[in-house]
């Protein structure tokens, strides 16, 4: 049986990367919340 998680660096960066987050208002909100929380990594 094929597993559900098939890692791909390109797919990860395109959907969850910093530039992808900054492209939408909701994404910018995620970055803002992660900064406020003090996350070392803001995006994938």
Swiss-Prot record:
<dbReference type="GO" id="GO:0003735">
    <property type="term" value="F:structural constituent of ribosome"/>
</dbReference>
<dbReference type="Pfam" id="PF00468">
    <property type="entry name" value="Ribosomal_L34"/>
</dbReference>
<dbReference type="GO" id="GO:0005840">
    <property type="term" value="C:ribosome"/>
</dbReference>
<keyword id="KW-0687">Ribonucleoprotein</keyword>
<dbReference type="InterPro" id="IPR020939">
    <property type="entry name" value="Ribosomal_bL34_CS"/>
</dbReference>
<keyword id="KW-0689">Ribosomal protein</keyword>
<dbReference type="GO" id="GO:0006412">
    <property type="term" value="P:translation"/>
</dbReference>
<dbReference type="GO" id="GO:1990904">
    <property type="term" value="C:ribonucleoprotein complex"/>
</dbReference>
<dbReference type="InterPro" id="IPR000271">
    <property type="entry name" value="Ribosomal_bL34"/>
</dbReference>
<protein>
    <recommendedName>
        <fullName>Large ribosomal subunit protein bL34</fullName>
    </recommendedName>
</protein>
<comment type="similarity">
    <text>Belongs to the bacterial ribosomal protein bL34 family.</text>
</comment>
